[in-house]
Amino acid sequence: MSKKFLIIGATGSVGSSLSKLINDNSLEAHLVAKNEEEVSKISDETGFSYSVADVLETNFIEKIEKDLNGIDIMGIAYCVGSIDLKPINLVTKKDYLNSFGLNFFPVIDLIKKFQENLKKN
């Protein structure tokens, strides 16, 4: 069974740079991004498999899991993120919830889903 890193947010500057670094070190990865056109370009450059999924969708893990097809995950790089910069007196509860919805909850769900796989690798 193949062992790969899982790179979520593979089309951003951090995720794409990490993909190239992993490839340069003769390691393997499975890329995940919401933009198929962009992630397929990185896949073509690296030869890595990929999934198209948006972490804000409730079924994003199922989409990824379907595409993994028996691949062992040896590490997760969560390269998705956003920061809403504004003075604290202008920040609303909705801003906090949106930030946690993107930057925190999806990565916790990923770790919960793949924790047994990560432990053995």
Language model: regions and residue ranges:
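Conserved NAD(P)H cofactor-binding loop of Rossmann-fold oxidoreductase domains
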Residues: A77-L85
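A short, exposed helix-loop element centered on a Lys and neighboring polar residues
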Residues: I111-K112
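N-terminal Rossmann NAD(P)H-binding glycine-rich loop of SDR-like oxidoreductase domains
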Residues: T11, G15-K20
